[in-house]
Structure formats: C-alpha cells, structure tokens
C-alpha cells in the first residue's frame, strides 16, 4: 500500500513540475532532452545548444520567443542535463556543473549572457 501511495505521489510531483512521467521520474544524462521538457530546461539554462535552432550561423530560441536572434558561436554551450529524484543537473561540457532542486529551480544564465552576441542585419 505504501509503495502504491509513493508511486502516485511521484507521478503527481512530475505533473506539478511540468516534467513528463518517466521511470522513477529520472532522466539519464542527455544532450537531447525530450521535446516536452525543453520549456523547463531552457528556462534555467538558456545557453544550451538544444534550446536553439540555428541556420546559416543565426540562431532562434525554440522556447522563449522574446529572446533575440543571436550569432551561433557567441553564446551556445554543449549541455547535458539529467534528473535523479529531485536533483536536476546541467553539465556544461567543460567540467562545470549546475545542480539544483528540480522543484526549486535557480536560473544559471548570467555567466553565459556576457558572451552573447545579438544578431544585427549589418552582420551579414
């Protein structure tokens, strides 16, 4: 009975967080999170390459329409994300990790915004 209750509680927690239901609520380390989770991951680490769609060196954010177009290599980082119980982790590919409680997320965008180059038509 307790196991069933805990299972239901875990499913409800994922729905509240906006995360899809997966085995145990876990997400193995990936650089390509499920499409339905992009809104969550890209809010708290918007410089991850998987958050952007790029063509001809110009990139548009897949989730946040208010983000400006950017030059491809100025801001984007190769990220891997994972979730284990209530710990969400961003691995930036350079040995830096950002770990947070999934239910109490903290943005980690500021260090990367300093390198962002916004696309201007004159850049062509």
Swiss-Prot record:
Glycans are attached at residue 64. Pfam families: v110 (PF01639). It comes from the Viruses. It is found in: Virion; Host endoplasmic reticulum-Golgi intermediate compartment. Its main location: virion. The keyword Cell membrane does not apply. The keyword Signal applies. Belongs to the asfivirus MGF 110 family. Causes the redistribution of lumenal ER protein to an enlarged ERGIC compartment. This is Protein MGF 110-4L. It comes from African swine fever virus (isolate Tick/Malawi/Lil 20-1/1983) (ASFV).
């Amino acid at each position: 009975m307790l196991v069933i209750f805990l299972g239901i509680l875990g499913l409800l927690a994922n729905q509240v967080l906006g995360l899809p239901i997966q085995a145990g609520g876990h997400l193995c380390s990936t650089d390509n999170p499920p499409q339905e989770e992009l809104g969550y991951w890209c809010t708290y680490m918007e410089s991850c390459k998987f958050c952007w769609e790029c063509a001809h060196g110009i990139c548009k954010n897949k989730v946040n329409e208010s983000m400006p177009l950017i030059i491809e290599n100025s801001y984007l980082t190769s990220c891997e994300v994972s979730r284990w119980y209530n710990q969400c982790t961003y691995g930036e590919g350079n040995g830096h990790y950002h770990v947070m409680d999934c239910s109490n997320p903290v943005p980690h965008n500021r260090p990367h915004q300093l390198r962002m180059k916004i696309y201007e038509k004159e850049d062509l």
